[in-house]
Amino acid sequence: MKLSRRSFMKANAVAAAAAAAGLSVPGVARAVVGQQEAIKWDKAPCRFCGTGCGVLVGTQQGRVVACQGDPDAPVNRGLNCIKGYFLPKIMYGKDRLTQPMLRMKDGSYHKDGEFTPVSWEQAFDVMEEKFKTSLKEKGPEAIGMFGSGQWTIWEGYAAAKLFKAGFRSNNIDPNARHCMASAVVGFMRTFGMDEPMGCYDDIEQADAFVLWGSNMAEMHPILWSRITNRRLSDPNVKVAVLSTFQHRSFELADNGIVFTPQSDLVILNYIANYIIQNNAVNQDFFTKHVNLRKGATDIGYGLRPTHPLEKAAKNPGSDASEPMSFDEYKAFVAEYTLDKTAEMTGVPKDQLEQLAQLYADPNKRVISYWTMGFNQHTRGVWANNLVYNLHLLTGKISQPGCGPFSLTGQPSACGTAREVGTFSHRLPADMVVTNEKHRDICEKHWQIPAGTIPAKVGLHAVAQDRALKDGKLNVYWVMCNNNMQAGPNINEDRMPGWRDPRNFIIVSDPYPTVSALSADLILPTAMWVEKEGAYGNAERRTQFWRQQIKAPGEAKSDLWQLVQFSRRFKTEEVWPEALLSQKPELRGKTLYDVLFATPAVSKFPLSELKEDQLNDESRELGFYLQKGLFEEYAWFGRGHGHDLAPFDDYHNARGLRWPVVEGKETQWRYSEGNDPYVKAGEGYKFYGKPDGKAVIFALPFEPAAESPDNEYDLWLSTGRVLEHWHTGSMTRRVPELHRAFPEAVVFIHPLDAKARDLRRGDKVKVSSRRGEVISIVETRGRNRPPQGLVYMPFFDAAQLVNNLTLDATDPLSKETDFKKCAVKLAKV
């Protein structure tokens, strides 16, 4: 391959930048630079985590052949992590699904049949029959959908509209329930609005970074490279990392803290106490902008009502709170002394004091980052509320370099799962199904009869598993996730429901995942740039991309599947007469007609697409579907602090952070001069709350749902590794990533291994009260658990670690605690 001088310099610049950030550049990234003239390039956000890195996608002869970091992308500035560099290869696994597959026996569907190729017509015929039978016999509560924070914005919007307005079922929930639900409820309780008030620009202006249950070095490596650059360029910048085990982020930490599982609640209250005792409360900010409330306690663990822990709880699932005075709050946190905190957490006193001093120092700009360590927690909402307390006490919020920041793990957990409202209790723009006014807004905008959207909250993720097992949920459509592997307590609740002959399970996926192979019908799905899409990242940045290639075989996008399936239902088959009588003109029409082919959605003509621009869905329907859906959806947030820009602006930008008002994005919300919704003279206004004030909550320590005992004597924490994303359904099909980390291992302290006669490399049986897996002992390497705890990643389909985990959830957010259950080890 011949390189021009310009191409050679560009290739070396990429390599040098990556090396400076501690990132590697694989050969595929270097090789593409010299082929620029032969390759067509276009922009897209990365397919993986919630960071939202921009990439340039190279296509040639109908295939993605190359990928490189987009130097014009403000998030990553031309860099990619190791997964981002291998994006092209996720598309072309040898077992890519290209046609629908139905379990069949003797020529027809059978629950115990073999997967057999069928046409889309046949697949939809079976789905139609199953949906209509369940709707007729049991009603809307008998059908459900489990979606994704990887859906594009219009896919999630179409799914929510089809289920909540079309089928009149709120039994739709995203896999973001497993990762971001606690953050959502935490934001709503404290601020009355979802999502962070800051942005990634804070990194270059902060004086201190505190990571709470977040291994950014591996899970958000591009952001970590920016933090690393900030830390190494200024000796006064400090980094504190808190976790239940040591990991790669500890390598940069000035204060690396390993605490006893669940005791982060104690540390948070101790810091609040320290701030008050050392007169570090920002009195002016606190007096003007904060209210105090005492939350209900002893709220249970989100288990079945028959579980002993739920029976014993005084206030199961209670979100109640009552006003309290500052003196009462001061007395409440005063119980969390330094001595008590050190004893309960196992953290040395000097480390606790150093941490508290970062927050208390009025001259230090502090950012708190967290991910699953906080959120996947039976008191995850409380943990979110308690870290907000620290920033509200000190006024370190909504200003450059200051603020609490919940990081997301999926590319559109914010943009789709949260903003669109694909949760079982939500509607677009932070509205909820239980609020009559909110339902009325949606019904009028969608031009459907009043009362169409049910007022009852639907089944959340774990409740869906239980309802399937109990035979109450009978038709279940899973899209863009691998929950059979990723969800908790596989043996006891999920697998029995999926294989119950009363139930029919559909999985839409590009690959034969554990979930797909456990289903009754598999629908082959288009991936990433095989469709036009939009994601919303962790800093409220909405990013668009165009379809750049066609999907293989008969694979279709989730959007196509939803819209085309809606044609199978007439309004009379899904809506009662009481609704139809309000709008008799809708009789005889299909759900496609009343939801997706409406004047509002279909008004943008195909002429808005360039002649050679791929867009399979729109060209098949005859109008610009994605634009119609987006503009209809964006209406909900405009003028209400969730403003999205006009559709076309996003194709011309590297993303925009909402609220976007008069063409200008917002970096810092709630503060005067930064947020267009805060008027001159107001200083700060937390306008999600009626009085414009945020809330500090008094919430205590409460123990985990399950702790080690004499038989199951070790804590188990689960999570990810750098090389693989979630269940590995994409990354394990990339040979280089698979070789880098080919199978899951059990990270264990050397002394715990020695006490059990285990050595590095030994096979070991890991058992809990719910199941067991066989794994490999690892006493060295990147993760270093303390004695009494083991860590396992969940990417390996041959080691289903979620056979072990407990389906306990935060009672407020319904998010599963994947970080704490009890296990034992035995040599194999």
UniProtKB/Swiss-Prot annotation:
Subcellular location: Periplasm
Cofactor note: Binds 1 [4Fe-4S] cluster. Binds 1 molybdenum-bis(molybdopterin guanine dinucleotide) (Mo-bis-MGD) cofactor per subunit.
CDD domains: MopB_CT_Nitrate-R-NapA-like, MopB_Nitrate-R-NapA-like
Recorded GO CC terms: membrane; nitrate reductase complex; periplasmic space
Subunit structure: Component of the periplasmic nitrate reductase NapAB complex composed of NapA and NapB.
Catalytic activity line of the entry: 2 Fe(II)-[cytochrome] + nitrate + 2 H(+) = 2 Fe(III)-[cytochrome] + nitrite + H2O
GO process annotations (BP): cellular respiration; Mo-molybdopterin cofactor biosynthetic process; nitrate assimilation
Signal peptide: 1-31
Keywords: 4Fe-4S, Electron transport, Iron, Iron-sulfur, Metal-binding, Molybdenum, Nitrate assimilation, Oxidoreductase, Periplasm, Signal, Transport
PROSITE patterns reported for this sequence: 4FE4S_MOW_BIS_MGD, MOLYBDOPTERIN_PROK_1, TAT
One GO MF term attached to the UniProt entry: molybdenum ion binding
Family according to the record: Belongs to the prokaryotic molybdopterin-containing oxidoreductase family. NasA/NapA/NarB subfamily.
Names of required cofactors: [4Fe-4S] cluster; Mo-bis(molybdopterin guanine dinucleotide)
Organism of origin: Salmonella dublin (strain CT_02021853)
Keyword Isomerase: no
Mod. after translation: Predicted to be exported by the Tat system. The position of the signal peptide cleavage has not been experimentally proven.
Binding residue positions for substrate: F794
UniProt feature coiled coil, ranges: none
Amino-acid positions noted as binding [4Fe-4S] cluster in the UniProt annotation, renumbered to this chain: C46, C49, C53, C81
Domain 4Fe-4S Mo/W bis-MGD-type: 39-95
UniProt keyword Oxidoreductase present: yes
Taxonomic lineage from the root: Bacteria, Pseudomonadati, Pseudomonadota, Gammaproteobacteria, Enterobacterales
UniProt binding sites for Mo-bis(molybdopterin guanine dinucleotide): 83, 150, 175, 179, 212-219, 243-247, 262-264, 372, 376, 482, 508-509, 531, 558, 718-727, 802, 819
Known function: Catalytic subunit of the periplasmic nitrate reductase complex NapAB. Receives electrons from NapB and catalyzes the reduction of nitrate to nitrite.
Protein name listed in UniProt: Periplasmic nitrate reductase
EC number: 1.9.6.1
Primary localization class, coarse: periplasm
